[in-house]
Amino acid sequence: MPKCEANGHHKIIINKEAPNVPFYTPVQDPPAGTSYDVQPEGSLFSLIKIRNLTLQNRIFVSPMCQYSAKDGVMTPWHKQHLGSFAARGPGLIVTEVNAVSPEGRISPEDAGIYDDGQLGPLRDIVDFVHSQGAKIAIQIGHAGRKASTVVPWLDRKNTAF
């Protein structure tokens, strides 16, 4: 076990495991994004409560289309992408849009929430984000007239912006 010298005494330091995750990841205590400054801080790093939801700060990560899903299922890319934000301490992360039907995706590579098989990978992402002290929200939608097309970089002249 690692030991360190603190005020002339040996102190054992143990890295605690984050709960509710099927693999080891250290718990962040206090969570990343917590202000250590004892002087009055701006509201950005203060808690915010919205009904029954309490967020550790007011830093939110907005949704970003990744065009990296397979048959509407989020992949390890999504876990890495969203998890990298979670480890840096925002109060809330919003996933990219998850389509309500296969035809409602912008492209075949968009995430969906219309099949039970899509829930497992999403659950893994949620568990990891929570293990880092952040909250996560899902953006649900239908692409409307832009639905069932290709990713923007494959056909720029026919992409509706």
Predicted regions and their residues:
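Flavin-dependent oxidoreductase catalytic cores
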Residues: 1-161
